[in-house]
Every structure is written in structure tokens, then in C-alpha cells.
């Protein structure tokens, strides 16, 4: 969990693929338009960019608003219930557009689509499309099918939430805006950590990493288009390649990747998110102060300062181990900017557990901490702990403390 945004953002597309004036659309009324709204983390933003690119390559253009769109897609988040409820409410409101345009196509993409699948058709009457996290490369094809069905007066529900080998290698195209100097690059998909509170292994699948050479070529292409700063994305990004690639001369695959990107001419800054404390090995810590392009910033989710809660969460480290990691990185990089994620109100969290977290936050002096109230996610181990649930008013109090 990496500081995900609670609200959704509509995707801004560059002129080469998206924006067209009203005069242009009036002159070419046959060009279908699409409105794509994104909820959640940076990985969702990157996925939406890939979807937008595939739609633009197929002849779609960006709609200036939902009301003007022939196709409306919501790329969803499932990390917390609030994010799902926002997307569901949004879609319910969007259905009213059918009064003026009965042919408008409505679809869910991403994590909630993956988690709920076909059941969304029962929840949301009139839904055309549900596409999961391993099928983003099929969105344009399925949208075409849904539009044809609507136009012919025989609308039908289309869903694809299956697993697909190699899907991690399909998120590689970009739609850059004019003078855009930053970009996200997805290096892996999925997570095998199975923290007790987290739905990501269900919605994103098993860990799969892209080849180093393929990532380097993508970054070179971005730099050739004016990008100066790249952020590498992965659910546990610093564990990149541990299933597919060997450790070489004591260097883990992620460090090997960073070293190769350090060599890319024209790239000025390199970031990554979100790492896991268990992946902060000595070789990665050593990159701070050694690799000139690696930004002096680390977002490292701690989740709790209580050893008891960390064990229940299945995090695989203690509060002191976390402290030692930060001390080592700060020793290498004294000016390091440090941010984190914290969950309060986890099932069974006592006042003493919360105070341990509070003390850790005070001691470390993070530049920023994203504090989240625990949100039960169906299918996780923590969701079964109803007997030890923390009252909502206590969660809120700790969240606001």
C-alpha cells in the first residue's frame, strides 16, 4: 500500500492521442470519444495511460466531459471499501446519461472489476463492460464489441477477468503531454506477500516481473521524448525479479535494474514506489549516495509500530528492524526525505499497540505519513477477525490524533 489517493482523477492525454477541439469533432463526428476516470494508486494511473493509448491507436479521441463521451470507463481501486463505493456511486449516476444517449458504453476496469467480476452486472443494471487487471490490453477490443452491440440495439454484458501469462509485459506504451518531463514505468505486477489486511494478491495476482532490457528500452524511449524523471512502479517494487532473475555478485535483480537505468543518457532522476521493508537489503541501501540519479526520497510503509500487530499483519519484520533500515539509509543519505503508510484500528489493536505506533512516528520524524483507518476487505485473513474489530469511533479518533 503506497499512499494511494482516495479520490479519482480523469486522465489527461497528450494532443497526439487525445485532445481534439469541438470544431474538430464537429467536422469528424464519426470519431468515437472516451472518458476515462482513475481511482487509486500510481499503478492504476499507469494502467489507465496504457488503456488510453490503446484506445487512441484504435481511433478513439478523448472526451472533454462525461456528457460528451461515447464511452465512459472507470478504472477502480479495491484497497479500501471507500474507493469501491465511490466508483459504484459514480457509475450509478452515469447511467442517467442514457436518457440522452442510449448508445453510451459504461465499463469498470481494474482492481474492483477483478475482485467482483460478473457480479457487477447484477449490482449495476445496464453495465456493458468489466475488465480485470491482467486484461488491460483487451479493453479497446471489448469496447468496440460493446459499442457495436449498443448501436445495433442488442446490448450485452462483456467481462474478462481471467489470468493471462505475460500480462505484465503489456503495460509499456505511453501518452505523453506536451513538455511532460516525468513518467511512470511499471516493472512488475502482483504480490506474493499476502499481508493479512491486503486484497492486492487477489486483485493483481502473483508476482510477475518484466525483463531488465525491456524496461531499459522503455525508459530510453521516454527520455528521447523529453522525459527527465522516471518512477518505477510495483506493489513490492524492491522485490522485483526475485522469481525470475538471479542475484549477481551480491546484487539483487532490483539493484541490477537501478544500475542499468543509471547508465541511460539523458535520464536525470529515478524514483520507485512502493517498496517493502523486507526488500530493503544491504545492496539496495548502498545505492543511496552511490547512484547519482536515485532521488533522495524513500516511501517505506511501516503500517504499525507494534511488534504484536506487525506479526498479526504478517509483515515479516519488527519495529526495531524497521528503525535500523531507516538509520542505515539515513547514514548513507543524510538529506533523505522519508514518508510512510500507517494503518490504525486494525482488528485487535489495543491502546498500547497504537501508542507504540505513535512513538515510532514521533521518533522517526517522517516528512509525511499517510494514516489510514483499517478497512476490512472480503477474502483477506483480517476480515475474518470480527470478534476483535475496533469500534469505528476509536478508528476515527486514532486517525485524527
Where in the sequence are the language-model features?
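Charged/polar low-complexity intrinsically disordered segments
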Residues: 4-5
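Aromatic (phenylalanine/tyrosine) cluster motif
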Residues: 17-19, 24-30
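Proteins enriched for Cys/Gly/acidic motifs involved in redox and nucleic-acid/cofactor modification
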Residues: 30-241, 253, 283, 288, ...
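Conserved strand-turn element in the central/C-terminal portion of the radical SAM core barrel
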Residues: 194, 198-205, 269-278, 304-314, ...
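Short glycine/threonine-rich loop-to-helix capping motif typified by GTGT followed
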Residues: 244-248, 285, 348-356
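Radical SAM/AdoMet-radical enzyme domain recognition
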Residues: 255, 263-264, 269, 281-340
Amino acid at each position: 500500500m503506497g499512499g494511494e489517493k482516495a479520490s479519482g482523477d480523469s486522465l489527461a492525454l497528450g494532443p497526439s492521442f487525445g485532445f481534439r477541439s469541438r470544431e474538430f469533432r464537429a467536422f469528424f463526428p464519426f470519431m468515437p470519444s472516451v472518458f476515462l476516470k482513475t481511482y487509486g494508486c500510481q499503478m492504476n494511473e499507469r494502467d489507465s495511460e496504457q488503456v488510453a493509448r490503446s484506445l487512441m491507436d484504435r481511433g478513439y479521441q478523448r472526451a472533454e466531459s462525461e456528457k460528451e463521451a461515447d464511452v465512459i470507463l472507470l478504472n477502480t481501486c479495491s484497497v479500501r471499501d471507500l474507493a469501491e463505493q465511490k466508483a459504484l456511486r459514480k457509475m450509478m449516476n452515469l447511467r442517467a446519461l442514457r436518457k440522452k444517449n442510449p448508445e453510451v458504453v459504461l465499463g469498470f476496469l481494474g482492481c474492483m472489476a477483478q475482485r467482483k467480476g460478473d457480479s457487477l452486472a447484477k449490482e449495476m443494471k445496464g453495465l456493458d463492460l468489466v475488465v480485470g487487471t491482467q486484461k488491460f490490453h483487451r479493453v479497446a477490443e471489448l469496447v468496440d464489441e460493446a459499442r457495436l452491440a449498443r448501436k445495433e440495439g442488442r446490448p450485452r454484458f462483456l467481462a474478462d477477468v481471467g489470468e493471462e501469462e505475460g500480462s505484465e509485459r503489456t503495460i509499456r506504451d505511453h501518452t505523453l503531454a506536451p513538455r511532460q518531463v516525468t513518467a511512470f514505468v511499471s516493472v512488475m505486477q502482483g504480490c506474493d506477500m499476502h499481508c493479512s489486511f491486503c486484497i492486492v494478491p487477489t486483485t493483481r495476482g502473483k508476482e510477475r516481473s518484466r525483463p531488465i532490457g525491456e524496461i531499459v528500452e522503455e525508459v530510453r524511449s521516454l527520455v528521447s521524448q523529453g522525459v527527465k524523471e522516471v518512477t518505477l512502479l510495483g506493489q513490492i517494487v524492491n522485490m522485483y525479479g526475485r522469481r525470475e532473475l538471479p542475484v549477481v555478485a551480491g546484487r539483487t535483480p532490483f539493484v541490477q535494474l537501478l544500475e542499468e537505468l543509471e547508465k541511460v543518457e539523458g535520464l536525470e532522476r529515478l524514483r520507485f514506489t512502493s517498496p517493502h521493508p523486507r526488500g530493503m537489503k544491504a545492496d539496495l541501501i548502498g545505492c543511496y549516495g552511490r547512484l547519482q540519479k536515485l532521488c533522495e526520497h524513500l516511501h517505506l510503509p511501516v503500517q504499525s509500530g507494534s511488534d504484536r500487530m506487525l506479526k498479526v499483519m504478517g509483515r515479516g519484520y519488527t519495529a526495531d528492524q524497521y528503525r535500523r533500515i531507516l538509520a542505515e539509509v539515513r547514514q548513507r543519505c543524510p538529506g533523505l526525505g522519508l514518508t510512510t503508510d500507517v494503518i490504525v484500528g486494525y482488528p485487535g489493536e489495543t491502546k498500547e499497540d497504537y501508542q507504540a505506533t505513535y512513538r515510532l512516528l514521533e521518533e522517526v520524524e517522517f516528512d509525511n505519513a499517510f494514516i489510514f483507518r483499517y478497512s476490512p476487505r472480503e477474502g483477506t485473513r483480517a476480515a475474518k477477525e470480527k470478534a476483535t474489530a475496533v469500534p469505528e469511533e476509536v478508528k476515527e479518533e486514532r486517525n485524527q490524533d
